[in-house]
Structure formats: C-alpha cells, structure tokens
Regions:
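Nucleotide-activated sugar donor-binding and catalytic core shared by glycosyltransferases
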Residues: 1-396
C-alpha cells in the first residue's frame, strides 16, 4: 500500500512502483495518489488532487474530504492486508494512517522525509513510534534520524534520474512559438492551487518590469497538470502588454532546460532547477495568517531547499513581504544580463547536485522495500550515493 500527495510525491511514487515491478513483476500495489502512480499500475482508492493545500486557513475546506479518504484507506488496509505501507512525504495526511498500520501489523516505510528539521520537530517522536524505516533523499536528513535512533537509509534524490528534458532546446521553444535567439525567463508558480493564487499575480506583475530591463525577453510558464485555467488569468495582462508568454503543461524539465534564468516558487522545483543548472530566484507567499503562525515555528534561516543543502545562501530568496514585483524584476534581470553572476550560481548549483546521490534512487528505494528486513540500516549493493553531511539549517 502506498500513499502520496502533490505532483512531486506522485512522481516519486510512480518511479518507485516502476522499480518495484522490475524486481517483482507480480507485486500488487494499491493506495492514494495521482496519474503517475496510476500509470505505474497502482490500484488507486483515491486521487490526491483537491487534497493538497498550503497553509492553515487553506486546509480547512478539505478537512471533511480528507477524513473520508483516510477512513477509506484504513478500511482498504484492513481488507487487503498489505505487507508494507509506503508513505511518501505528505505528512499532514499520511501521519494519520500510521497508527492504523501499526495496529494491523503492517511494516511502515516513510519515503521522502517530512521537513522535521524546518518545523514541527515533535513529529520525530511519531516517526520513532510508528515507522520501521526512513528512506531519505537529502544527505543531511540521514544524520538527523541516526541521532534519534530511527533506522534510516539515504537512497539519493529520485530527480537525479527523472530531471531530463524531452526535446532539444531550440525545437521546444519553437514548438511553443518562442524565439531561441532571445532571452527566456521561466516562471514556476507552484503545483497547488493555493500556491498559484498567492504567487502567480506577483510574477505576472513583475513580467513587464523585467521586459523594461531586458529587451526581447520571453516568458515560459511551467503548468502542473490538472490545474484550472482560471488560476492562470493573471498572465492575461502580460499578454495584453504584448509580451511573449508560453504556458506549457507537464513539461517542467523542458521548461527549465530551455530557460536562461528561472523564478520559482519554493519547493521541489528548486531542486529540479538545480539539476538543470538553471540560475534562479526563489519566491514564496502564504496567507498573512498562515505566515504569522508559521514564523513562530520555522527553525531554518532559508526556505529554498538548494540553500539548505548547500548550507548557505547560494540563490536569492524573496519571501512574503520581500516578494514584490520590483524585487523579482531586479533579481531576474540581473541573472539574465550579468553572465558572471549567472555562471557563479551555476557552479554553486553543481555542488548541490553532487550531494544528491548517483542515479538509481528509485531502484535503491525499491530494493530496500524488497528485502523485507527492516531491523537494520543495511548497506545497499549500489554505487556510493554521496556523503551524508549534517546540514539541517542554512549557514550552520
């Protein structure tokens, strides 16, 4: 049984199931996820879309549906009795399934750690109580769980395998009616509806300011699947100003590989951009209520994962009140015009890529599940995936 939420979790879960089927073609997989997990052959009891939100106030409208889905998954586990339950990130949902799995005697593996090092560290006790093994994708997470006495394995980041462009840059840009000879700024506003509502208006307002600083600039927008067209209405004003804008669905890697610089919402996309060596600016905004509450609990000095992995601020971050159209335009224009700065950032991003492990993360995770041995943190018979450096906070 497997449970994931959000586009990134669905991507990782689907790749994991593909790798499991290479080991055991007859493996039965069911649970909660999205189209990528379904494409891997999982029997989905529910689809995560509509459950994934950011923030406290944003979560209230989905609580009733979440409880119904949790009950359906608990009942499915009681009926079908899986050997292993794999939780993929999505802790606000998945943590509520852990006690039921323990009561049924189902082994629990958590693949892709919740960000305990950033906030809500009390969740570590829940993991220690209910989880048989953690499979982590960032090197500094291994040391955190080892200190807590939780069996853990660093398998590497699945995006090392998955972050691949499908088309040559020039062909991709021409297919989307953009000129390969002109500068391209990619905009990645997030994958959740709540993120787009908070982030995309600011990016749209910044676009004409970037154009005023960088003549000929074009805008390439990465759109996550299954998002409503109305969420992208802020871009209508950009088009009305005569600026070239292409919105591309389900091709984030091609967008990143084609861009000269990127403005991205904080999250998985920052790692994806790093793997493509794309100079970037990280932005984020929450509701005022959620941000005010969250500031009291956040324990890190950076929001962007690339900065946390690097242990220092290698990519600029514009968060909440700092996220203004003027600030975005200044940073983006600098990356598009200052070649020395952009190249220095690419070198820093290469050091981040080197810590994320060798190819084969999904295969290593699948083999960890396939052993059935959850008592020790055994060494995988795979190439080294990188040294687990202890960097829970930026600048530490």
């Amino acid at each position: 049984m497997i449970s994931c939420g959000e586009a990134s979790g669905d991507l990782y879960a689907g790749a994991l199931v593909d790798a499991l089927r290479e080991i055991d073609p007859g493996v039965e997989v069911f649970g909660f996820g999205g189209e990528r997990l379904r494409a891997a052959g999982a029997d989905l009891i529910g689809d995560y879309r509509g459950f994934s939100v950011t923030g406290l106030s944003e979560a209230l409208p989905v609580l009733s549906r979440s409880w119904k889905m949790l009950n359906a998954l608990r009942e499915a586990a009681r009926t079908r009795r899986p050997d292993v339950f794999v939780a993929v990130d999505f802790p606000d949902f998945n943590f509520r399934l852990l006690p039921a799995m323990r009561a049924l005697g189902v082994k629990v593996v958590y693949y892709v750690s919740p960000q305990l090092w950033a906030w809500r560290p009390a969740r570590l006790e829940t993991i220690r109580r209910y989880v048989d093994r953690m499979l982590v994708i960032f090197p500094f997470e291994k040391a955190l769980y080892e200190r807590a006495g939780v069996p853990v394995e660093f398998v590497g980041h699945p995006l090392v395998d998955l972050a691949r462009a499908g088309q040559p840059r020039d062909a991709f840009l021409r297919a989307n009616k953009l000129d390969p000879a002109r500068p391209v700024l990619a905009l990645l506003p997030g994958s959740r509806p709540s993120e787009l509502r908070h982030v995309l208006p600011g990016l749209a307002a910044a676009a004409p300011l970037v154009a005023a600083r960088v003549p000929g600039v074009q805008f390439l927008v990465a759109r996550a699947p299954a998002l409503d067209d109305g969420l992208f209405a802020p871009l209508d004003a950009v088009r009305a100003a005569g600026l070239p804008v292409a919105i591309v669905t389900g091709a984030t890697d091609d967008v990143l590989a084609s861009a000269d610089a990127v403005v991205t919402a904080s999250g998985t996309a920052t790692v994806q951009a790093a793997l493509h060596g794309a100079p970037m600016v990280i932005v984020y905004r929450l509701s005022a209520f959620t941000y005010a509450v969250g500031r009291r609990f956040v324990r890190v000095s950076s929001y962007g994962m690339v900065n946390l992995v690097a242990g220092r601020l290698i990519v600029p971050e514009l968060i909440q009140d700092q996220f203004t159209p003027e600030a975005v335009a200044a940073e983006a224009a600098s990356l598009l015009t200052d070649r020395a700065r952009a190249e220095a950032m690419r070198r820093d991003l290469a050091t981040v890529r080197a810590t994320l492990g060798s190819p084969g993360a999904s295969r290593r995770a699948a083999r960890a599940l396939g052993t059935g041995d959850f008592s020790t943190d055994r060494a995988m018979k795979e190439p080294e995936v990188g040294r687990a450096n202890d960097r829970p906070t930026s600048g530490s």
